[in-house]
């Protein structure tokens, strides 16, 4: 009985109680329909009452046995239904508990043996990951989409990793950046920073983040498809810049300047990229340029002395300003003009393009002779002189002498045809 008290609801027990008591009760009740009430003595009856009731009282006896049987049947049926329902619910709960336990055990064994997608501690530090706003791609999907990261799907190499074309299905292709040096603390920090920044920034000249993947010691970032790879691969790869006309180069320069202007002027607080170079500029099928590689990006108020390269003041005192990005833009502009790498290594002593080019750019008569052979004689010389002057200003050793990126943009837009996003009208 104690066990039943714990298992069955109180109304079921009450049903059994009424059933046991009802069987013992078979008493009847007498209902007086007419005549003098037996509870009133005859001596106290009025003459009128006697006149109306000359004969003996008529009594109708109604037994409660039939009523008790109906109540008893109802209680038995309801109690039985409740018992069956409770037993079914208990069984269902036990069944679900066992299935959940077995499922959890199976998942745990599978993750221990296969070790599929790992969730490194650094991933959970990313604000956008915690908020669930960034899709997470399975490594097996990206591996299959790139044909196991085959060389045939390489868009460009360099920078912080290798870019691959990934075909997710017949209608969807993306760019996958597979980071080098997986597992190293600085690489993980760069990965974390880039994913977090790209999740917050939206601009036509900043690459769009589609998701990421972390698998064991490998980290991948998924971008929108950039069919033409990086600017570095276009300028210094097998084609040696032959596919980039003067107008396309000016378009790329304007696109980069627009992206930087958004970071410096329209982000609050302003953002400094700090790692701008030709390998971090990606090109889509129409050669629209978009900035990537935000692994070192920071807000303008933050000072960090762990700089890789860039302007001289960065290396000396670690100060970070928007003029750092202007210097880097000037280096890219020199690469577009001259077709040379930012740092050439013809001998044991590497030579910076700034050191080599700035003295030569001041000689207008000789300037056309040092241009990239792929664009010689294809531009208006006035436009060439203006671009060269902008580049020299951007790479000035003193940061205060460098222009704002907005001023740079306004200087270049008039040199670009309207159909390419500029204001130049060619008759």
From Swiss-Prot:
Indicate the segments forming the Protein kinase domain, all copies. 149-413
Q: Which reaction does it catalyse?
A: L-seryl-[protein] + ATP = O-phospho-L-seryl-[protein] + ADP + H(+); L-threonyl-[protein] + ATP = O-phospho-L-threonyl-[protein] + ADP + H(+)
Task: Enumerate the Gene3D superfamilies for this protein.
Answer: Phosphorylase Kinase, domain 1, Transferase(Phosphotransferase) domain 1
Give the UniProt keywords, A-Z: ATP-binding, Cell membrane, Kinase, Membrane, Nucleotide-binding, Phosphoprotein, Serine/threonine-protein kinase, Signal, Transferase, Transmembrane, Transmembrane helix
> According to the UniProt entry, which residues carry Phosphoserine?
279
Cell location: Cell membrane
Where is it mostly found?
membrane
The signal peptide stretch is: 1-22
User: Belongs to which family?
Assistant: Belongs to the protein kinase superfamily. Ser/Thr protein kinase family.
Q: What is this protein called?
A: Probable receptor-like protein kinase At1g80640
